[in-house]
């Protein structure tokens, strides 16, 4: 199981890559074209605190990737004990949580290397879509960038 501090470190690392790709939106798993390739020409040779844009305490843990549109980072997280899902939007410059929606769920057996938050959201200029499932349901929820639920 991934620890909260490890989750924060991984999140900060991914965010650095997303921030460095500046003009390129990171809209889905493996980026804009699904190939895991960024327009970033080089990465830091050594990792240090000066390369981190922000650190933010997040609820739960997750194995999904954050996505980026403009100045907003969207991600899915979940409580490893209760399976409660956390749909989050953060300011890409400060790490401040701009909005959050929490959804109760039921626990169930997971793959050894999975979590209750394994699906990466997708985002475009108008909406962000999150998905997750439990043994009885599959949930797909769309939100505006301001956090208003558009459909489920």
Question: Residue locations for each model-derived region?
Answer:
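Noncatalytic, solvent-exposed loop/strand surfaces
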Residues: 21-152
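Bacterial N-terminal signal peptides
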Residues: 9-19
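Bacterial N-terminal signal peptides that target proteins for export
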Residues: 1-11
């Amino acid at each position: 199981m991934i620890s909260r501090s490890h989750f924060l470190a991984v999140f900060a690392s991914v965010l650095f890559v997303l921030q460095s790709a500046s003009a390129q939106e990171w809209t889905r798993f493996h980026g804009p074209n699904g190939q895991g390739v960024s327009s970033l020409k080089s990465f830091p040779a050594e990792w240090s605190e000066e390369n981190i844009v922000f650190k933010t305490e997040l609820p739960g843990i997750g194995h999904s990737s954050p996505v980026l549109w403009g100045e907003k980072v969207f991600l899915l997280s979940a409580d490893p004990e209760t399976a409660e899902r956390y749909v989050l939007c953060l300011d890409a410059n400060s790490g401040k949580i701009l909005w959050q929606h929490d959804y109760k769920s039921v626990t169930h057996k997971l793959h050894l290397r999975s979590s209750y938050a394994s699906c990466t959201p997708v985002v475009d200029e108008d909406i962000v879509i999150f998905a997750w499932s439990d043994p009885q349901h599959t949930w797909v929820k769309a939100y505006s960038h301001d956090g208003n639920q558009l459909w489920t």
